């Protein structure tokens, strides 16, 4: 603790001190000194350079300026009030806002509250986490996991076959204009007429609301609306009036393709606005919400479930897992993969999504993915707090 201070006024620009190399010597087995040792001055200079490394890679709490302030305060005399006031003023200055007006609200700025703040974390070795989901408030479609896949209507057959097998194996469902495979559940995006083979059907909300004779699918098929950011409020009212089963929220307005999702960051406020309208009408349990857009990981999916969705739809992430090139705005499947590799990749993606989402639920003390709720989340930026309807970290105030 009594080593001389190694702080150097030139610590930011000190060059590296190179030790002279002497080789292994005539008798290497005797382990001679192969490099010259540092002098005291050189050792202090190198220690100062280490301080620079720490400062450049340190946490936000200990930036370069804050560390320099600490050293300055350590050398100040008790009676030097002017310098004390100067240091205090510098510490009270607001830092530059790293998020300008163009900063978008994304799921990255939402974090989960750990369960040990209020309850016990769930041990995966002792208790499982339920992932089974019933999609549809009235006529339900039973899924083993709360995930559906979309965007492969125009993909090559070998890609569709791989995705279909993974969907079937996981007990998920495919969202598209045509079925992806005989064994995979299919939620039909209706353009002309409904298919009796579809496990559920979803209609474009604007077209459905403009059609006075809209009646939905068959009596046994769950019926939903494909909703975008512009018509979410009217779609909620219409769906409740017609006793529909679910709303598929697509802020990019691109389903059944992936162009909308790949065009930019999704509008995550669509979930908050849909839930807010349902709560305003006191009919939150009468219809289910499915979210699509920008989901890259199981953590993203868990955040969407916590914000009010009962299931989510994976699109671009699955395409990327299968080696797609998305630089042109639509996925181009040109990766050199054989059938086994494609099947394994698509299977692994859904497996990873499910495992990671379950992990987030367990970390919040939940044994069912559907028990995730907005109270399990906090926002770290004001724009996301407003978009998602979630309080800022360290606060109960919702912006």
Where do the language-model regions lie?
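A glycine-rich phosphate-binding loop feature that marks nucleotide/adenosyl-phosphate handling sites
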Residues: 1-4, 63-67, 181-182, 226, ...
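Ferredoxin-type iron-sulfur electron-transfer modules and their immediate structural context
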Residues: 1-88, 92, 230-231, 260-269, ...
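Gly-rich Lys/Arg/Thr-decorated short loops/hinges at beta-loop-alpha junctions or inter-strand turns
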Residues: 25-27, 143-149, 251-261
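Conserved, well-structured core domains of diverse proteins
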Residues: 56, 63-168, 172-173, 374-399
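Catalytic alpha/beta active-site cores
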Residues: 145-150, 157-217, 233, 237
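A structural motif
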Residues: 171-172, 198, 244, 309, ...
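Glycine-rich phosphate/ribose-binding loops and adjacent secondary-structure elements
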Residues: 201-341
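Catalytic or ion-coupling anion/metal-binding cores of large enzyme and transporter domains
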Residues: 329-337, 345-399
């Amino acid at each position: 603790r009594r080593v001389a201070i190694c702080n150097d006024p030139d610590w930011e620009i000190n060059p590296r001190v190179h030790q002279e190399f002497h080789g292994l010597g005539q008798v290497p087995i005797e382990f001679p000194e192969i490099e010259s040792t540092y002098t005291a001055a050189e050792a202090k200079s190198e220690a100062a350079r280490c301080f620079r490394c720490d400062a450049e890679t340190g946490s936000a709490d200990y930036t370069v300026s804050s560390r320099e302030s600490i050293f300055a305060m350590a050398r100040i005399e008790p009676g030097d009030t002017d310098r004390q006031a100067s240091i205090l003023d510098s510490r009270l200055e607001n830092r530059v806002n790293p998020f300008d007006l163009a900063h978008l609200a994304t799921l990255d700025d939402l974090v989960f509250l750990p369960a040990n703040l209020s309850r016990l974390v769930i041990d995966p070795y002792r208790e499982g986490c339920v992932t089974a989901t019933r999609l549809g408030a009235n006529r339900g479609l039973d899924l083993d996991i709360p995930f559906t896949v979309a965007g492969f209507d125009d993909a090559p057959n070998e890609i569709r076959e791989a995705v279909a097998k993974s969907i079937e194996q996981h007990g998920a469902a495919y969202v598209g204009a045509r079925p992806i495979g005989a064994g995979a559940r299919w939620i039909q995006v209706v353009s002309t007429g409904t298919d009796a083979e579809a496990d559920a059907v979803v209609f474009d909300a604007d077209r459905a609301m403009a059609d006075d004779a809209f009646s939905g699918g068959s009596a046994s098929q769950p019926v939903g609306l494909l909703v975008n950011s512009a018509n979410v409020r009217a779609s909620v009212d219409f769906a409740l009036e017609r006793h529909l089963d679910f709303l598929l929220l697509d802020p990019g307005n691109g389903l059944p393709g992936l162009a909308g999702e790949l065009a930019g960051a999704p509008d995550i406020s669509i979930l908050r606005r849909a839930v807010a309208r349902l709560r305003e009408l006191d009919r939150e349990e009468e219809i289910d919400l499915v979210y699509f857009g920008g989901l890259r990981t199981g953590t993203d999916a868990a955040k969407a479930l916590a914000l009010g969705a009962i299931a989510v739809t994976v699109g671009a992430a699955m395409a990327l897992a299968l080696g797609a090139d998305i630089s042109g705005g639509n996925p181009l499947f040109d990766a050199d993969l054989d059938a086994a590799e494609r099947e394994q990749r698509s299977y692994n993606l859904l497996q990873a999504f499910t495992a990671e989402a379950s992990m987030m639920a367990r970390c919040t003390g939940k044994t069912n993915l559907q028990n995730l709720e907005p109270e399990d989340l906090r926002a770290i930026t004001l724009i996301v707090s407003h978009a998602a309807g979630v309080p800022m970290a360290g606060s109960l105030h919702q912006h």
